[in-house]
């Protein structure tokens, strides 16, 4: 999977609106140095009373998957209804299982460059409940996709600190563990409207102590990976666009390189919307962030 980017989670295309993200962007992503797209799917709202997915929604997804595969990209299908699941853990279960019943059957014959991610950032449930849900969803997938790679992360929003509580079947060697990283939140989420505790802006990042903290945090995950023999995906990381650009770029570069040094694949949050690496209205890369992610794209002059 190597280097990836999160896409289309908040695009109006899913609700019948005019799409910001176009199929042509897959080539742009590939040519921009990325090998993977993590498709952010908020599918529950597109289910009927029997938890069947809307055929039009599925057709839209098919088009995106096929267009990405045509460009040689790996596609992660990420079920991203974590907020709904946190609000009602019991009601989440039948929807999550129905989603994977339908998606695993629909994509059973796709190449192994289509990867399933069972649930983004589980939270609001105990570790035992999430481990049970993950095991049930994995069993559903394995009925039709016995060797497809499946991504599973720990609770508390895919927290590194919760990896030790993640339970994975030892005999299944087609599982990739995932974590997300936004440390320190005071820097990465400064000015974000949904995090009122981080209203202060202008916070810089990049001191030796800052860099050491990133290394120490990722070392915790790497120690778990080595002890458990599981590959890791850094499925999300990013700094909100209210942070100073120079510090955003420095942080992004540091986290991406730290992940690569440890042999992890990664997916930046995100292509469009906020935390962005690509300005769709201007039709151009946000150069400091793009170059931080993909150093080969830096202007040698």
What are these model-derived regions, one by one?
Residues 1, 92-96, 194, 214, ...:
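Generic hydrophobic, helix-prone segments enriched in Leu/Val/Ile
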